[in-house]
């Protein structure tokens, strides 16, 4: 691939991003994780590590430093650049799916510092490789220093066990009530580091190692060439280890360091023995094999190298992280969980099914599901105390999308319980209840109620009295019903199919009758029946979502469809559409919390990448292949009109938003937030609606909507238990057309591709006028 920016480039078919300088615009981090552990590794090796279970605890907060000292000359340097900011002769940081490696050369010593998180356990493994590139023997001292954060210093104790070589830190929660003591006993947390080669000296005290509180200067221990030893009590703990290494010319030395947390020193010893028996290489291979399986579910080859890299590699990683770690939070909305699982279904349908079912168990017998929830069993707080009304619609949209991937009608008959009830019902019945609830919770204009907010949950002013109505909720329900009806028909449930059709028509008619403002659809009606999101509003006139979802749901047609598209295009920037225009400049009680958000950020007028994918989806529905692809490509941090050097972000994940005020010097800056609903929708929209390799209730269908100047593209996709290699040709230079399909060299006329478990199909598709 071509170099994407002055700071780095993709290589190995997009599987690696190479950063060529330690001096990036921001902390350009990779994130490595398993189901219970997460760490961030910047281009200089810095970042936090978090253990999720038994409860979230942060360790190694603040710094991870490595120092090398030449014992003959006294020369010292930092192979990670920080903290001494030693200028290396050569430097590169290689971020990949499961690892980060930082290579540098200083004073004729080539160093490689490599880190990964094994598939199981709460630990990370660091490997230091030193090579003497000179012609003289070298005697070096290697110092490693990890800040072992463990819940405060007032009750902390850090010590080194000479026999096991385990340096560990433990801190019992200092401010704990009498009644909380037993619970704390059950959640003890010991943070540790240990080497595979014995340490020559160690430090447990941050002050002792650095010689004071300045952690950015050359440490006192490094100056002396040796750590002082001794334990630390009621002070900042540190895991510092020193080893002497001698190297002949051309010789290489390898040292491993394991950092993690456990419930006791005995558990660490046991884990250490298991790791030694298994071997570091085996653990690394397991990690690489896992990612090979995840990335192998589908592969695209289009004329757009950047989109290829994200679709084939980085979006898959991001969606796995968000789903498997629950976005690293116990405080989250079910809409996030469900939309993450929607994307996850494209790489692990079975895992996505279990995740969605765990969310579905939160649905009440009425059909309602609370939007913001605490997943750790703690009492509700903040947004969890509010009633956002869009939860049920996401159950339908995301679970039907999952069912399309799985093709398992038996899953619809699986019994799932309800929150606060001993009752259970089939998944199909759960979805019908969700539709019935939403359709029954309507206001004076026949639209779905707003409550404390819809998808745009900081709009909590208009519906706070219980009468406000949401145009978006209504459009989304129409879309959801259309997604559910094919499963009603598949099950032979014509009665519910007809009833749902009637509801969808009624709601669509209400939107077109009440919500059209002459040039676009309004956002809704407040508790007093006054429309908002209209041309008469000074701020918040035009909302992207009600235009895109009017198209996605089929509510907008004819001239209104054209006007919706024109309104959408008026919101465009070089990196995607703004979520609304104009943004709010200050508190407005009519609108609520959204007006308190900084203009140009998040929901208040940013280029909100999640909503940008709704726009790309709508473009595909409208047959605008070039516009859809442009939006997808512009949303990536590799966008040449807003490159990493300008947006400031490492280009291995899509952010939550880009700053949206055109007259601000921060226009286009990335939020750097790795948690976003963009990921699932970009995967789904790109694969199934732009490239058109679409899973349906009746099988895999082909319906591309691409840039007209594309001559061809290829998609390899595992679908259910079969594999397809699909080559699409576009000799007429069109965005959308009829498709002429051959399967294994034979003409294929059916609407869906053939399916037989275990088969591999070669498919050729030609777009025709």
Curated annotation (Swiss-Prot):
Swiss-Prot/TrEMBL catalytic activity: 3-O-beta-D-glucosyl-D-glucuronate + phosphate = aldehydo-D-glucuronate + alpha-D-glucose 1-phosphate; a 3-O-beta-D-glucosyl-beta-D-glucuronoside + phosphate = a beta-D-glucuronoside + alpha-D-glucose 1-phosphate
Active site: 457
Pfam family, one: Glyco_hydro_36
Superkingdom of source: Bacteria
Keyword Transferase: yes
A GO biological-process term: carbohydrate metabolic process
pH dependence text: Optimum pH is 6.9 (for the reverse phosphorolytic activity). Stable between pH 6.6 and 8.8 at 4 degrees Celsius for 24 hours.
Principal EC category: transferase
Alphabetical list of InterPro entries matching this protein: 6-hairpin_glycosidase_sf, 6hp_glycosidase-like_sf, Carb-bd_put_dom, Gal_mutarotase_sf_dom, GH36_catalytic, GH94_Enzymes, Glyco_hydro_65_N_sf, Glyco_hydrolase_94
Temperature and activity: Optimum temperature is 35 degrees Celsius (for the reverse phosphorolytic activity). Retains more than 90% of its original activity after incubation at 30 degrees Celsius for 1 hour.
Record EC number: 2.4.1.392
Cell compartment(s), UniProt: Cytoplasm
GO molecular function term, any single one: glycosyltransferase activity
GO cellular component: cytoplasm
Keywords for this protein: Carbohydrate metabolism, Cytoplasm, Glycosyltransferase, Transferase
Family statement: Belongs to the glycosyl hydrolase 94 family.
Description of how the protein assembles with itself and partners: Homodimer.
Chain's role: Glycoside phosphorylase that catalyzes the reversible phosphorolysis of 3-O-beta-D-glucosyl-D-glucuronate into D-glucuronic acid and alpha-D-glucose 1-phosphate. Cannot phosphorolyze cellobionic acid and laminaribiose. In the reverse direction, using alpha-D-glucose 1-phosphate as a donor substrate, the enzyme acts on D-glucuronate and its artificial derivative p-nitrophenyl-beta-D-glucuronide. The apparent catalytic efficiency towards p-nitrophenyl-beta-D-glucuronide is approximately 5-fold higher than that towards D-glucuronic acid.
Designated name of the protein: 3-O-beta-D-glucopyranosyl-beta-D-glucuronide phosphorylase
Source species: Paenibacillus borealis
Upper classification of the organism: Bacteria, Bacillati, Bacillota, Bacilli, Bacillales
